[in-house]
């Protein structure tokens, strides 16, 4: 059975994508952003450095929330074993691929900690032509909602999906299902590899629980100020929603 969304404070709804190649660079970013960011996503690049769990431990010691974004996809027994071990760490979110119902159910049954599992639906870098090339001649939103419902039925706690689909997902799944939206672009589209993007406020108005932001903060002339500006947008959107 899916668990209720994490009880996130307003300042914990911004997740910074810590897409750097080393422990030292990761911690430098955490120190640089200070109190402006309380939640960090760590993904594949840090895994390849061999320092992944050192970073995870360092974040936990700084009282930061951690999102493990490794998009697990394997046979059910292998994924279940991985989730069982990972649930022993101080992790708030973890991603698994949303393509296999049996694997999702096994992952959900193995998750005995407070970690929330998020199913990957359709990557925000993909559009309809990419789906067609994979033999799926449907609109991304339809595929995403279908996978969100399948994930919930399997006991997964939520999804990671484009903000463009936050509204349809929320209407389909109801309030007790986590929606985390990556590819957020505070100033609008910027012509990078993200295709299905939305702004900060729109994601929350449409039902997101949290957003993931990377380059708009990392490439800003003043990253902490950029994060603070996003936090202000989040607070305003939550007030508009009555949260």
Curated annotation (Swiss-Prot):
It comes from the Bacteria. Pfam families: OMPdecase. Homodimer. The gene is pyrF. One of its GO terms (molecular function) is orotidine-5'-phosphate decarboxylase activity. Pathway: Pyrimidine metabolism; UMP biosynthesis via de novo pathway; UMP from orotate: step 2/2. HAMAP family: OMPdecase_type1_B. It catalyses: orotidine 5'-phosphate + H(+) = UMP + CO2. Keywords: Decarboxylase, Lyase, Pyrimidine biosynthesis. Catalyzes the decarboxylation of orotidine 5'-monophosphate (OMP) to uridine 5'-monophosphate (UMP). It is an enzyme of class 4 (lyase). GO terms for cellular component: cytosol. This is Orotidine 5'-phosphate decarboxylase. Belongs to the OMP decarboxylase family. Type 1 subfamily. The active site is at 71 (proton donor). It comes from Xanthomonas axonopodis pv. citri (strain 306). Coiled coil: none annotated.
């Amino acid at each position: 059975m899916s668990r209720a969304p994490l009880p996130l404070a307003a300042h914990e709804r911004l997740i910074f994508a810590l897409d750097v190649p080393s422990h030292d660079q990761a911690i430098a970013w955490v120190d640089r952003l200070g109190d402006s960011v309380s939640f960090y996503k760590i993904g594949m690049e840090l895994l390849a450095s061999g320092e992944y769990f050192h970073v995870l431990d360092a974040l936990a010691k700084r009282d930061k929330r951690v999102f493990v974004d490794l998009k697990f996809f394997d046979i059910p027994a292998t994924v279940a074993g991985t989730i069982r071990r990972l649930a022993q760490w101080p992790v708030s979110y973890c991603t698994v691929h949303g393509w296999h119902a049996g694997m999702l159910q096994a992952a959900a049954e193995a998750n005995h900690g407070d970690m929330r599992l998020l199913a990957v639906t359709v990557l925000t870098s993909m559009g309809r032509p990419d789906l067609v090339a994979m033999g799926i001649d449907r609109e991304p939103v339809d595929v995403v909602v279908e996978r969100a419902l399948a994930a919930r039925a399997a006991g997964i706690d939520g999804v990671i999906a484009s903000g463009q689909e936050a509204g349809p997902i929320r209407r389909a799944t109801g309030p007790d299902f986590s929606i985390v939206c990556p590819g957020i672009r505070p100033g609008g589209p910027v012509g990078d590899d993200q295709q299905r993007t939305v702004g900060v406020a729109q994601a929350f108005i449409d039902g997101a629980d949290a957003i993931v932001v990377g380059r708009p903060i990392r490439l800003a002339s003043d990253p902490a100020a950029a994060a603070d500006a996003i936090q202000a947008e989040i607070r305003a959107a939550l007030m508009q929603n009555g949260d």
